[in-house]
């Protein structure tokens, strides 16, 4: 199994902070957002990681290298200046992902997780989602759960 980290975005909501540093390289304590994700992915047993890049992508590529220092193999899907969005970024990286299920993570996710993803896809599941509680300012959220499974996905207005 492989993982893909979405790291091509501009990070515009962070204002001037991302003018010279891409959001995935934002430091929290002694690590960057993207390194935290790489370590969590590795801890879950996955060693092949594809990372899409665009905005300041060369800095991400230079910082992470081939993944050897994280005991993983990193392959980059460079979107150039186009920023293809989530779906376009995945589509652009399909040659690197093969046809097997893969783990998809946003580069700006910062949490501790360790999932045996190989055991979570059962009974014809198309995906396994890790969701977080809704913040107080958005109590309804985008998903509804029934018996621990996503049953409704609200459309964005």
PLM ranges: what are they?
Residues 1-19:
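N-terminal nucleotide-binding beta1-loop-alpha1 segment
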Residues 2-5, 31-106:
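Conserved N-terminal catalytic core of the sugar/cofactor nucleotidyltransferase
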Residues 7, 29, 78-80, 131-132, ...:
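Residues at the C-termini of beta-strands that transition into short coil/loop
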Residues 10, 107-109, 134:
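Active-site metal-binding loops of divalent metal-dependent hydrolases
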Residues 15-16, 37, 61-63, 87, ...:
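Short glycine-/acidic-enriched loop or helix-start segments at secondary-structure transitions
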Residues 20-35:
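Short catalytic helix/loop segments, enriched in acidic residues and glycine
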Residues 24, 73-75, 126:
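Conserved beta-strand segments of alpha/beta enzyme cores
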Residues 111-157:
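Conserved core of the sugar-phosphate nucleotidyltransferase
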């Amino acid at each position: 199994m492989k993982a893909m980290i979405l790291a091509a975005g501009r990070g515009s909501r962070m204002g001037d902070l991302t003018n010279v540093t891409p959001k995935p390289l934002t430091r929290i304590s002694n690590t960057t957002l993207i390194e935290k994700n790489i370590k969590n992915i590795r801890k879950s047993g996955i060693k092949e990681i594809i990372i899409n890049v665009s905005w300041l992508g060369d800095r991400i590529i230079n910082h992470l290298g081939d993944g050897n220092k994280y005991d993983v193999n990193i392959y980059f899907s460079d979107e150039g200046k186009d920023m293809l969005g989530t779906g376009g970024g995945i589509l652009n990286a399909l040659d690197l992902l093969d046809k097997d299920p893969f783990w998809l993570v946003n580069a700006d996710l910062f949490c501790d997780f360790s999932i045996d993803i190989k055991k979570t896809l059962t009974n014809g599941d198309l995906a396994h989602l890790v969701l977080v509680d809704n913040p107080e300012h958005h109590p309804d959220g985008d998903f509804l759960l029934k018996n621990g499974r996503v049953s409704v996905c609200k459309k964005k207005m």
